[in-house]
């Protein structure tokens, strides 16, 4: 579960290293985001000469959550850290590479470009 003030790692090569959630999109009083949800983030740490800079306010798709993720077949998947991929207004990734595995729940949320760039889909 991702909520406001949650710090996330960035799982792409957009130039950001760490971001903080400042808003969960999708409804007036929505509090939590999970895998595949779009959030508004602020860049807290970035590498030099990257596409994004520290302080930028951007959109991101949550790709990994620390909380257990239950599936229809009864299995559970869990990641070590919370991670997101920076996207533009059309939900296309800003970076050209994705690092680490992503869950197949992203397919149901129509983030096919992220799935195609990911090295492993769990």
UniProtKB/Swiss-Prot annotation:
Cellular component, GO, one term: cytosolic large ribosomal subunit
Matching entries from PROSITE patterns are given as: RIBOSOMAL_L14
Q: Keywords of this protein's UniProt record, alphabetized?
A: Ribonucleoprotein, Ribosomal protein, RNA-binding, rRNA-binding
Gene3D superfamilies from the xrefs? Ribosomal protein L14
One GO MF term, please?
structural constituent of ribosome
Which biological process terms from the Gene Ontology are attached to this UniProt entry?
translation
- Which family would the database say this protein is a member of? Belongs to the universal ribosomal protein uL14 family.
Q: Which HAMAP family match?
A: Ribosomal_uL14 (MF_01367)
User: What is the role of the protein in this entry?
Assistant: Binds to 23S rRNA. Forms part of two intersubunit bridges in the 70S ribosome.
Quaternary arrangement and interactors, per the entry?
Answer: Part of the 50S ribosomal subunit. Forms a cluster with proteins L3 and L19. In the 70S ribosome, L14 and L19 interact and together make contacts with the 16S rRNA in bridges B5 and B8.
Protein name per Swiss-Prot or TrEMBL: Large ribosomal subunit protein uL14
| Source organism of the structure | Caulobacter vibrioides (strain NA1000 / CB15N) (Caulobacter crescentus)
Species lineage: Bacteria, Pseudomonadati, Pseudomonadota, Alphaproteobacteria, Caulobacterales
């Amino acid at each position: 579960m991702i909520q406001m003030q949650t710090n996330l790692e960035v799982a792409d090569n957009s130039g950001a290293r760490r971001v903080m959630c400042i808003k969960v999109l999708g409804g007036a009083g929505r509090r939590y985001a999970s895998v595949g949800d779009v959030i508004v983030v602020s860049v807290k740490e970035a590498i030099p000469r990257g596409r994004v800079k520290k302080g930028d306010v951007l959109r991101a798709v949550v790709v990994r959550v620390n909380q257990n993720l239950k599936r229809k077949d009864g299995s559970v998947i869990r990641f070590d850290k919370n991670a997101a991929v920076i996207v533009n207004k059309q939900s296309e990734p800003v970076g050209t590479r994705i690092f680490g595995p992503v869950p197949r729940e992203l397919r149901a949320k129509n983030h096919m470009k992220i799935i195609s760039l990911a090295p492993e889909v769990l």
